[in-house]
Amino acid sequence: MALSKLDNLYRAVILDHSSAPRHAGELKQACVIDMNNPTCGDVIRLTVDFTEDKISDIAFSGHGCTISTASASMMTEAVIGKTKEEALELAAIFSQMVTGHTDSAQERLGDGQFLAGVSKFPQRVKCSTLAWNALKKAIEADGTATVSESH
């Protein structure tokens, strides 16, 4: 069965973010969150710099599957420059989307909306939400802590 042009576009965007992730690396002066997905081996270190209530810079490192890496890249693009509240709203929209609850708000995710198809593969939901959950932990830590945990 041939993929439709739209499916090909989604696949190309996901592969692009996975092979050339945006905001890859680590920030020196930032909140550090280490998380892993023990079911598949994905590991992420998210570093977030908050200036007042906004995400002024963000970066991630680690290793993971295509979905995990692409999602982290897409998340960093979506939340940089956003307030903590806006970032949490985007995380909630993303979580709803990858569990099959879609609405027009997912357009706010930018390229992240291309991961909506993950909802068809429940075993991949944790891969797609790892970076977003790390972001939530960074915001909950009020940008001052180093947190390590499993997802």
Regions inferred by a protein language model and the residue ranges of each:
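Short, thiol/selenol-centered motifs that function as redox-active sites or metal-ligating centers
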Residues: H63-T69
